[in-house]
Amino acid sequence: QRPTKADVVIGVPDSSISAAIGYSEASGIPYEMGLVKNKYIARTFIQPSQEMREKGVRMKLSAVRSLVKDKSVVLIDDSIVRGTTSLRIVRLLKEAGAKEVHVRIASPAITNPCFYGIDMSTREELLCARMSKEEACKAIEADSLEFLSEESLLKSGNRSELCMACFNGCYPTSLYQNKLNK
C-alpha cells in the first residue's frame, strides 16, 4: 500500500522485517538489510523518559552505508508512537548517504492512548495525535510518510480479536472509553 519510487526497501529490525519483505515483493523494489540491530538494547519506545528513549535509539541501530549511499530508500516500520525512533532512523539513513527516505508504516496512525498494557497513556505524547500527517512527516525529517489504512489492517487478520482502539478510539470496554472522554 502507498507505493513510491525508490531504489531499496529497508525494514526496521526486527518488528518490521516481514512487512518490508511484503512491501518489496508488492512494489518490485529490492529488499535489503540496511539496518543492523544491537540485540542487547530493549524496545526503546517503552523506556520511562524521553532522554532514555533517545539514548536507546542511538545505541540500538546502525545503517549499512554500502546499501543506502546515494539511494532513495523506503523505510518500513511497524508503527510511530512518539516519533523518537522514526526521527533517529531517518537521520541515521541520511547520515549514511541516503538521498531520500520515504517512511511507510505497517499500521494506521496511532492517535489514541492504550489502556491495555502498552506504554502510551496520553494523546499528548502521541506524534500523530498532535500533528497532521504532513506535520509528522516534517517532524521525523522524512521525504514522505504514509500509513496502512484501517481497512487493509483489518483484511490482514482476524477482525474479532484485533483491538483497534489506539487507531480509531473505539475501546472494547466502556470503562476506558469513559476514561478517554474525561
Regions found by a protein language model. Name each.
Residues 1-182:
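PRPP-associated nucleotide enzymes
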